[in-house]
């Protein structure tokens, strides 16, 4: 199984939050973890913002960013192409998604259609999770998540 992580899921692999343990276990069970190229900028920005907002966590967040940098080359990275962003635009319209959420969904769909292995989609946004289900994706969800 390939685990596709949107940015919220990717951050949970590096920053200890509710749900991190379950997601880390899922990532450990996967044959590969896939991400969209934009997840790099989004994840680094999220960690930097949190470090500014909670200065006491800055050192741990710097370490998390360094681990992300070290691990990045091990991920299956889906490139952002014209075809992908056009598909993302369709998904934004069809599923009422935010721009980058629709790009994440289109990237996951690209991996799913490549069909090398089953894909499981990990995210922490209910609307995005629902759209992935409509597209026939297996969705990672913690107990109690819709």
Language-model segments: which ranges?
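Short active-site oxyanion
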Residues: 1, 30-33, 74-76, 116-120
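Short, well-structured N-terminal submotif of metal-dependent ribonuclease cores
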Residues: 1-39, 50-63, 137, 143-144
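Acidic, PIN/NYN-like endoribonuclease modules and their adjacent C-terminal/linker elements
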Residues: 2, 106, 110-146
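Short, contiguous hydrophobic alpha-helices characteristic of membrane insertion segments
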Residues: 11-17, 75-80, 121, 135-138
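Noncatalytic, solvent-exposed loop/strand surfaces
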Residues: 18-21, 25, 49-52, 67, ...
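Short beta-strand scaffold positions
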Residues: 35, 79, 99-102, 122-123
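Acidic catalytic patch
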Residues: 40, 70-95, 102-107
């Amino acid at each position: 199984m390939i685990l596709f992580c949107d940015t919220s899921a990717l951050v949970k692999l590096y920053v200890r939050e509710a749900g991190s343990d379950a997601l880390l276990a899922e990532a450990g069970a996967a044959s590969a973890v896939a991400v969209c190229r934009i997840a790099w900028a989004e994840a680094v920005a999220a960690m930097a913002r949190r470090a500014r907002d909670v200065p006491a966590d800055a050192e741990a967040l710097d370490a998390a960013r360094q681990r992300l940098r070290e691990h990045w080359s091990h991920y299956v990275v889906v490139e952002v192409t014209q075809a992908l962003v056009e598909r993302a635009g369709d998904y934004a319209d069809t599923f009422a998604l935010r721009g980058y959420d629709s790009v994440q969904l289109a990237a996951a769909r690209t991996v799913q259609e490549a069909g090398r292995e089953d894909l499981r989609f990990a995210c922490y946004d209910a609307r995005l999770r629902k759209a992935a289900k409509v597209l026939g994706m297996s969705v990672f969800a913690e107990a109690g998540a819709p």
